[in-house]
Every structure is written in structure tokens, then in C-alpha cells.
């Protein structure tokens, strides 16, 4: 689940010397690792190897537990933001001969989805003899598109596929 980078801490650091940064972010300079460990120990903090690939490696004096907590917190925030921006495609299915009130309920749901920023995929179902009257579906699709034209634009034009007429509405982009 967590993709946190593992840092070497205190005695795990294998370099002979390091570029030391104190807990306030001030650069102390290049010091032997033993001296850096001693300074960190005196302050009651940990010595953490931040950039092991650098020559000499960069080490920082800090509270490692707090550092890990902050990293996890940032990762959670990033995941949360990513989830917020995901656009879902919501499916709405209805028959071609839908009753007026039922259509209004479906339109209300579509409007809610579009206002939340989701796309809506509309499936108009043809049953039996309705298949020979595709104009019924076209008429209903046009009506739905017109009703939602203030907040939605057609992303995929109505197209008959088998027993369904399918089209996709996307929220209008804000200018």
C-alpha cells in the first residue's frame, strides 16, 4: 500500500563522512559520521541519510518518527486529491417509452451527476417492436440533450447498438 522510501537512520548509515544539516535546516558542513551521530544523540534526535547518492551523502538531524509521519500524511493528501479529481462515468438506463415523471427523475439524477463533474452514459433500451422505430430513441435523446444543454455537452453522439441507443454527456467546461 505505502510506497514510502526507506531511509538509513543512525548506525545504518555506512558512509565515513556526510554533509550534515541540523534540525533547523542550517548546513553544518562535511563532518565524520561518528561526530554527526554524537551531535544528533546529544540533541535527542536521529541522524537520517536524506540523499545517499550524493558525494558525500547528505544527512539531516531530525526526529525520524515525526519525519515518517509527515511523509505518510503528505502521501495520504496526494491520494485524496487524486481521488477527488477522478471523473467517473455514471450509467443511466431507461426504456424508449419512458413515462414523463420517470424521465424527470432520470433527468434530475443526470443533472446531479453532471454537476458533480461526472460524465453520464445514457442507455435507451428498445424492446420488441420498438426496434423498428429508432426515431423514438432519437427524439428522446434529443430531448434529454436539450434539457441538459445548460450544464452538459454531448461527448459521444447517440448511436444505435443492438437493442440500445447509447450516448455520453460530459459536464460543460468552465471558461
UniProtKB/Swiss-Prot annotation:
Keyword annotations for this protein, in alphabetical order, are: Cytoplasm, Initiation factor, Protein biosynthesis
What are the disulphide bonds in this sequence? none
Listed under GO biological process in this entry are: ribosome disassembly
- Asked if the Swiss-Prot or TrEMBL record annotates the protein with the keyword Lipoprotein, the reply is no
Q: Name one GO molecular function term.
A: translation initiation factor activity
Report the subcellular localization. Cytoplasm
* Keyword Cytoplasm on entry: yes
Q: State one Pfam family annotation.
A: IF3_C
Q: Kindly list the GO CC terms recorded for this protein.
A: cytosol
Q: What does this protein do?
A: IF-3 binds to the 30S ribosomal subunit and shifts the equilibrium between 70S ribosomes and their 50S and 30S subunits in favor of the free subunits, thus enhancing the availability of 30S subunits on which protein synthesis initiation begins.
Q: How does it assemble?
A: Monomer.
Question: What does the sequence similarity comment in the record state about its family?
Answer: Belongs to the IF-3 family.
**Name assigned to this protein:** Translation initiation factor IF-3
Query: Which gene does this sequence derive from?
Result: infC
Amino acid at each position: 500500500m505505502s510506497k514510502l522510501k526507506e531511509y538509513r537512520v543512525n548506525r545504518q548509515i555506512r558512509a565515513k563522512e556526510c554533509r550534515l544539516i541540523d534540525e533547523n535546516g542550517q548546513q553544518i558542513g562535511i563532518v565524520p559520521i561518528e561526530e554527526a551521530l554524537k551531535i544528533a544523540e546529544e540533541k535527542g534526535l536521529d541522524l537520517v541519510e536524506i540523499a545517499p547518492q550524493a558525494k558525500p551523502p547528505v544527512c539531516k538531524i531530525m526526529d525520524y518518527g515525526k519525519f515518517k509521519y509527515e511523509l505518510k500524511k503528505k502521501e495520504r493528501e496526494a491520494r485524496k486529491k487524486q481521488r477527488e479529481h477522478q471523473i467517473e462515468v455514471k450509467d443511466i438506463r431507461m426504456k424508449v417509452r419512458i413515462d414523463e415523471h420517470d424521465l424527470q427523475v432520470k433527468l434530475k439524477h443526470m443533472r446531479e451527476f453532471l454537476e458533480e463533474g461526472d460524465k453520464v452514459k445514457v442507455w435507451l433500451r428498445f424492446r420488441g417492436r420498438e426496434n423498428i422505430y429508432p426515431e423514438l430513441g432519437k427524439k428522446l435523446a434529443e430531448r434529454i440533450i436539450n434539457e441538459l444543454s445548460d450544464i452538459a455537452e454531448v461527448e459521444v453522439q447517440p448511436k444505435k447498438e443492438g437493442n440500445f441507443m447509447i450516448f455520453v454527456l460530459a459536464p460543460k467546461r468552465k471558461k
